[in-house]
Amino acid sequence: MTDNSPQPHRRGLNRRTFLAGAAATGAAAGLGALGSTARGAGTASAASRFPLPSKASSLHVLVTGDAGTGEKPQYAVTAAARRIHATTPFDLALGLGDNIYETGPKGPDDHQFTTKFEKPNAGLDFPWLMTLGNHDNTAVFPGDGGWLLRGDAEVAYHRRSRRWYMPARYYSVPLGVADVFVLDMNPLAAYIPPFLSPEWEPGGHYMTRQAAWLDRALRTSTAPWKIVCTHHPYANNGPHGPAGDFDGLPAPLNGVEMKRFIEKHVAGRAHFLFSGHDHSQQVLENVSGLKGTRQIVSGAAAKSVNGRSAGRFRAKYENYRDRGFMTLAIDSTSVVLTAHEVAANASGPTEAFTTTYRR
């Protein structure tokens, strides 16, 4: 393991105007201040934590995103995942951000970690590799992503939980047959950007360190499969839109700096880019700019956009109606991806789509 520290949204004039105004006045200048990664005293020792399958020749992976509500839909999705786990056990999970709705945790001992993560995921007893989302870094309004230090509480919680795995804001985990690289794109995709902060701003110390680390980690990885996880997607047919056009906002609020980062440091270097943020499930293909890296969106573990595809990117599968999750069966030569739907009136998951990727 390598670690490194330092409701559906709709496009609308009011929100766009507010956000642009916040950016213009430098509202985030004081919110993105330099700070070290939080370190909690903790109660979950390395010995008690659910073990990582670090030398696995095959993996069964649960993929969820935007899960942390603590409400009935989240429980329905995790109940469906437990049905699969009972017959074909998972080795680990990827949690793609927005882990604690609506405004993130107040600290590493916040009871929301229990009500919105531990209790809903009871019985899914394996490591959960967690990604920071915009709601996890809230400053002023839910999901603005403007208080980046708030996310450090989730890093500190790593030392208090058996299943929550987030040793730093960005990190990598070698898993034998696959290497996973969890990124923090929040400084480049916040609705209230960290202007005037040399630590957090685009081109600042934090993103420069993260880029250098990622370049080195991907270059030296010898795993058959390389999986990158972000909260914000590069490509997206849902209402949030893709990087460079998030929510129809002007630059830099539209994620254009994230778009450039992914194109420079991820595209063509990893096999998969898994993201959440949009409350939908999408299996996209042949995305221009990604140079063969496959964009997968799974952000429907507790919410649904109840919309339809914008059709901006070619898709093998899309669902904007149901909540759900994905599973991966990985060996040295193939990855079998399956999308599962969890309808409100259903007693279990529906296997909606499956596809196989080969080396």
Where are these regions (language model features)?
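Residue-level marker for buried hydrophobic side chains located in beta-strands
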Residues: 61-63, 93-95, 130, 228, ...
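N-terminal active-site segment of His-dependent metallophosphoesterases
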Residues: 42-112, 237
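Extended active-site neighborhood of metal-dependent phosphoesterases/phosphodiesterases
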Residues: 55, 82, 89, 101-226, ...
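N-terminal export leaders
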Residues: 13-29
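Active-site glycine-centered loops adjacent to acidic/histidine catalytic or metal-binding residues
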Residues: 66, 97-98, 133-134, 183, ...
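A short C-terminal boundary segment appended to hydrolase-like catalytic domains
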Residues: 317-359
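C-terminal region of N-terminal signal peptides and the immediate post-cleavage residues
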Residues: 29-49
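N-terminal secretory signal peptides
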Residues: 1-13, 27
